[in-house]
From Swiss-Prot:
Function, in words: Ribonuclease. Angiogenic. Plays a role in host defense. Exhibits strong antibacterial activity against Gram-negative bacteria but mild antibacterial activity against Gram-positive bacteria. The RNase activity is not required for the bactericidal activity.
Source taxonomy: Eukaryota, Metazoa, Chordata, Craniata, Vertebrata
Note, other: Although the OmpT protease is absent in Gram-positive bacteria, LF-ZF3 generated by a Gram-negative bacterium can penetrate a Gram-positive bacterium and exert its cytotoxicity.
Modified residues (Pyrrolidone carboxylic acid): 23
Organism for this UniProt entry: Danio rerio
Name of this protein: Ribonuclease-like 3
Length: 149
């Protein structure tokens, strides 16, 4: 195999290892999990039950135990992603955490009854707060907390 063919094969493998989002597959998986767990522009206080059930959000990813509390950011993924691409401030105590410069509307779904999916019942509460997320490169992969200002 010639040098040009080797180079082409290496470039092809490199491209195949990157997702359509432009990040490595493992970061893509964590980003997509973050979106499923914490980002939904259409959620309201009244729809916590349905959204938690449809997205199968449980205490542990492979279990059926109801999750006690889950926070949804009422926005789209691109808007939330701006926290990692210049719209957030790096936290001094953890270099991977960024606080949004602007507030987001969030819906906090708190378990009110039930123990196991799909019998979990939630109460939703809307608030406005800055969000703190972990970023891997330009991609949010973990919701840390919301901060009321």
């Amino acid at each position: 195999m010639g040098i040009h063919q080797c180079t082409a094969v290496v470039l092809l493998l490199l491209c195949a290892s990157l997702s359509t989002y432009g990040q490595p597959a493992e970061i893509r998986r964590r980003y997509e999990h973050f979106l499923t767990q914490h980002v939904y522009g259409g959620i309201t206080e009244q729809t916590c039950d349905r959204v938690m059930r449809q997205r199968r959000i449980t205490r542990f990813p492979t279990g059926n135990d109801c999750k006690e509390v889950n926070t949804f950011i009422q926005a789209n993924g691109n808007h939330v992603r701006t926290v990692c691409t210049g719209g957030g401030t790096r936290q001094t105590d953890n270099r991977d955490l960024y606080m949004s410069n602007n507030q987001f509307t969030v819906i906090t779904c708190t378990l009110r009854s039930g123990e196991r999916h799909p019998n979990c019942r939630y109460r939703g509460k809307e608030s406005s707060r800055k969000i703190v997320v972990a970023c891997e490169g330009e991609w949010p992969t973990h919701y840390e907390k919301g901060v009321i200002v």
